[in-house]
Amino acid sequence: HTGLDFSADTGTPIVSAAGGVVVAQEYHLAYGNMIEIDHGNDLISRYAHASMVFVKKGDLVKRGQKIAEVGTTGRSTGAHLHFEVLVQGVQQDSQKFLTAGGRNLPAQQVAKADTPSGQQRSVRW
């Protein structure tokens, strides 16, 4: 299992971890309603299992902007946000990007919910 899962109630806001351009907004068999945002420098963030999506391919988004709501679409056993980071198309340890340079955006704000361990993490892009 790649990425991080953030348990949250259906309808909980999902916000962009950093500014960028929406490069994918589609339904995927495993990920359900999925969004991918290109942040430049070959860095993509992926948000999966959304119940509602508020952006489309080509949209510019800002850090902290509401892009979707938590859901349980696709291959999912309960409402949560599945968050991934890809560099040059290769999945990375998403945890490393939650504390890498820049200003803090608490991961709780990305999912607006508790982290899997119940501890708050920071997204620093």
Each PLM stretch: what is its role?
Residues 1-125:
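Catalytic cores of peptidoglycan-degrading enzymes
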